[in-house]
Amino acid sequence: FITAGAAFIVSFLIATLNHFGGFVAMLLVMCLVAFVIINNNRKFKQKREQDNVDTLFRQLVRSHDKAETWDLLIQHVRRTQGDVLTFTRDTFRNITQGLMHENMKQLRTAAHAIEDEKGIWKRYRRKEIVGMRKIDYLLAVEKNTWFHLGCNSSTQLIYGLKRMLEPCIEHVDNNFKPLPQDYIDELIPLCNDVDKFLEEARRMITTGDFDGADAVSYT
């Protein structure tokens, strides 16, 4: 009954818009529907990725085999660290593009994404600390420093983006003089290098293949 009522109301609104607004109104409605579908699809993809990580965590919590728990924890850390690097790469690109093109909407989107990512990362970190408590004690002592270094690195990436974004928003929002073209020309190759570095770091962490780590560190 509720679904039928909602469908009737939507149909009535669309017919009204078509009657009074004609083709332009219908075009706007179609654009709005397309935006909603794309946005919902993006959110669904993000939720599915988080659910995959949560499934891995549930397996980790249920496991009573310390060797299996360690293997699951490694997989969990690889996924979460890879997710943070993917987020960092995308957000860094949005911030720099927003600054270069004076796009305030793009900068605001990056600001909201950073706040969301802070909450997501805190949940991941708490879960992985639980995992560290379930593995063999001596192994936990051995890996503890490296684990927290990885956590702190991910945290610093997120907060580094926030600190970088703040002056960019201030610059664009206050209508300061746009960046000169020669500054932009100098910035673009640097952005490309950072983008390649983050993608290569993500690939190495998620696959566990660090053969090219030295080459990446010197780029």
Named regions from a protein language model:
Residues 41-218:
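Cytosolic, long alpha-helical scaffolding segments
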Residues 1-2:
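Helix-loop-helix junctions within the multi-pass membrane cores of secondary transporters/permeases
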Residues 28-39:
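Hydrophobic core of alpha-helical transmembrane segments in multi-pass integral membrane proteins
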Residues 25-30, 109-110:
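Composition- and surface-driven signal marking solvent-exposed, interaction-prone regions
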Residues 5-25:
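Transmembrane helix-loop junctions at the membrane interface of multipass transporters and ion channels
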